[in-house]
Amino acid sequence: MKRIVIFADEPDWHCRRLLKAFAQRQAAASIVSLRKCGFSLGGDGSGLLIPGFERSLPDVALVRNIPSGSFEQVTFRLSLLHALRELGIPVVNDARAIERCVDKSMTSFLLHRAGIPTPATFVVEDQERAASWRRTEPADVVAKPLFGAQGRGLSRIAPGEPTPDPGGDPLRGVLYLQRYVGRARDWQDYRVFCVGEVAAAAMVRRGASWVTNVARGGVCEPAPCTGRLAELAAAAAAAVGAGYCGVDLIEDAERGFLVLEVNSMPAWKGLQSVAEIDLADRIAHHVLGL
């Protein structure tokens, strides 16, 4: 029987679905917080401290979330995931994929490098350079926190409005600016859930404003997970090396679907409410096949 560690802070809805999915596939899964893990070096053994896995390491690790904390704490927790990979334990998603997705600038770079269409993006620390770039942009731009999620900290800036000062919250020293793609009303975008670099399910998110995240009141509707939408989402997952992820896309009148972001630790409760497949079971199937 395979032993799975699910790294999460608490047994939320997602974890309960995953525990059930693994049990139905005759695998033993347990939830462990990365806060409780560590290193013990200098003696015998792997050098890793994972509660419940003192005698032997798990067969596979699945990361639901990494707790927030100081820069040192988050770096340490990522180091634990790096160490598991160095020891030959499959990690979904591993620290490399998480780092690539948490940092929006690296996500955008990897999408660009892979030839995946995205909105024009400019990332610098210097406010004057950002203002100079904005003067070449004919329309609104969106300023995003480099490490933001769930629609928090976004601001839409019209031509002629001042470029924000990157100091302080929410930008914290870095200006990540992206050309606004959307409508004057009837705002919507798409979330595609990928597992094993395959597009598994999709939804349309309709918002009361241009920020359509479910956490910001967006309404979920099913969408066909086919064609160009599925193709681009799968390509984005491959570009960042994610074993499972949520890919956000928007439709441009001229360029078609564009990839906005990739989330390496996605929630899927909203998508599950309109999906025909069990997404937790799809994740379990992928993890147990590694």
Feature map (PLM): residue ranges:
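Protein kinase-like catalytic core scaffold
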Residues: 141, 200-201, 245, 258-261
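Conserved N-proximal alpha/beta basic substrate-recognition cap immediately N-terminal to
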Residues: 9-120
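Rossmann-like NAD(P)H-binding beta-loop-alpha module
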Residues: 114-138
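Structural motif
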Residues: 62-64, 142, 176
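Glycine-rich phosphate/pyrophosphate-binding beta-alpha loops
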Residues: 263-275
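Phosphate-binding site of ATP-dependent enzymes
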Residues: 150-237
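Extreme N-terminal starter segment of soluble prokaryotic enzymes
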Residues: 1-5
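A long amphipathic alpha-helix within ATP-dependent nucleotide-binding catalytic cores
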Residues: 210-259, 280-290
